[in-house]
Amino acid sequence: MKDNLERAKLMVSSTVFSWLLLCLFAVTTSVSVQPTCTFPAIYNFGDSNSDTGGISAAFEPIRDPYGQGFFHRPTGRDSDGRLTIDFIAERLGLPYLSAYLNSLGSNFRHGANFATGGSTIRRQNETIFQYGISPFSLDMQIAQFDQFKARSALLFTQIKSRYDREKLPRQEEFAKALYTFDIGQNDLSVGFRTMSVDQLKATIPDIVNHLASAVRNIYQQGGRTFWVHNTGPFGCLPVNMFYMGTPAPGYLDKSGCVKAQNEMAMEFNRKLKETVINLRKELTQAAITYVDVYTAKYEMMSNPKKLGFANPLKVCCGYHEKYDHIWCGNKGKVNNTEIYGGSCPNPVMAVSWDGVHYTEAANKHVADRTLNGLLTDPPVPITRACYRQ
């Protein structure tokens, strides 16, 4: 009797184990048979973290030594080389994005970049000449996209030159394109300058709702795949330390970053993720990926040596000593001696390029940590981001 009972238990256990293996095989097979997403184009919206020449085309061109590493010349990027959006294009086998505002040498066959340095999600009552805030807020970038989409359709039917038509997007490919967002940091920076902490925190839901409206706009025009970056730990930007003096106890965290600013960034990210989850329910045909660049960037602050970096708070380009500050690419006098704010000898070891923006090496780390799905929700690589989870 006892032996029969034991045999029965073994049979049940074996059946359950076999069933679990079958389910695992079915899930694995289901995932493996999904073909890699083929994105014909990328349309990007953002700020200087992903601007490939927009603000430089609209205002004063970015000068040397920006771009010295990879491109060997300034290209309108706030870095010594490539940005995360460039690594996204590489991963998808697409050319680097031309800035929408760049009128010369642009090719929009495989997408366009509407991002500009200093952009915010919400419109700000400031000018770029005051605090560096771009006039091209997210709603303006979406309006530019609307116009771009409509005008490119018209031009495609009017232009007779095959060479010129090859620089225009195909209308049927807008629905298959990848739409990327990397914006929000400047909204928080402006808030810290103009509001109390409580006032700024109270504006976060509205800021995030403006971003959600942008996603809805593109969805209504046929866009289906969205790759949404959260905001980085802007309390770790070395510029925060330039004029700080001796910080009060508890002002900085263990990595030397401004705690209050990073806490606000995390609050923004919490609300953004919540909004992305709700958008998935609302936009039933959309595949929306939330991308945690905050963690990828903070890793470089907390474990720089492990990742191959030197002091992450040390600025690579520019001259910053005590009370003397000469920004990257500029000249100034220190003790009656002219100083050029040039590049450090080994940017690949640096995290911060100019005190505000990241080096190519840092941007590559962010790309490596996010494009494979390790820091995304849902946890899918960008090459499978077109599938709704």
Swiss-Prot record:
It is found in: Secreted. Glycans are attached at N125, N335. CDD domains: SGNH_plant_lipase_like. The active site is at S48 (nucleophile), D354, H357. Its main location: secreted. Pfam families: Lipase_GDSL. It comes from the Eukaryota. The keyword Secreted applies. One of its GO terms (biological process) is lipid catabolic process. Its EC number is 3.1.1.-. Residues 1-30 form the signal peptide. GO terms for molecular function: hydrolase activity, acting on ester bonds. GO terms for cellular component: extracellular region; plant-type cell wall; plasmodesma. Keywords: Glycoprotein, Hydrolase, Lipid degradation, Lipid metabolism, Secreted, Signal. It is an enzyme of class 3 (hydrolase). Belongs to the 'GDSL' lipolytic enzyme family. This is GDSL esterase/lipase At5g14450. It comes from Arabidopsis thaliana (Mouse-ear cress). The lineage of its organism: Eukaryota, Viridiplantae, Streptophyta, Embryophyta, Tracheophyta.
